[in-house]
Amino acid sequence: MKIVHYSDVEDVVIDKFPYKGKTNEVKGTSIRWLSKQGDDGHGYPEYGLRYFTIQPGGYIPIHNHFYHQTMYILEGRFECWCFDAASDEIKEKSIATPGHAVYIPSMEPHGMKNIGESPGAFLCCICNVYEQES
């Protein structure tokens, strides 16, 4: 067993996210890896729990990934976006506030912005998926 307090974990600023061969700017966002286990062979852990902080007006742009993720909003007000995979146009916008859980399936293009007036925070649990062998 390992017990950590989130404030004892390094807070790493994120300034870029890759998507479809391009690098997109991330604004006002930092991450703390509370736990991570395994290696999926693509540079990601098989399981992880992360603590994100996004400053007012900060955002995470369109991106996708192999792993499933569920975000649990702790503080703040977020506009969450789901994009059409072919056109990269926003196909759905939703507001998430404390107590909301946001599930993102594997490879779904998505992003979010802190639309509140104070820093927002959420837990993000990731779990990789694997292709079934035939």
Protein language model regions, located:
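Short acidic-glycine-tyrosine-enriched beta hairpin
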Residues: 85-106
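A short, N-terminal "cap"/entry segment at the start of jelly-roll beta-barrel domains
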Residues: 1-46, 94
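Conserved hydrophobic/aromatic beta-strand scaffold that supports enzyme active sites
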Residues: 31-33, 49-53, 70, 93, ...
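Short, conserved beta-strand element in jelly-roll/cupin
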Residues: 51-55, 65-80, 84, 125-127
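Double-stranded beta-helix
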Residues: 2-9, 16, 85-88, 109-134
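Short regulatory "switch" loops immediately downstream of catalytic or recognition motifs
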Residues: 33-37, 76-86, 92
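Short beta-strand His + acidic residue motifs that chelate non-heme Fe in jelly-roll/DSBH
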Residues: 60-62, 80-82, 104, 110-117
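Conserved short histidine dyad/triad with adjacent acidic residue
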Residues: 35-37, 48-65, 106
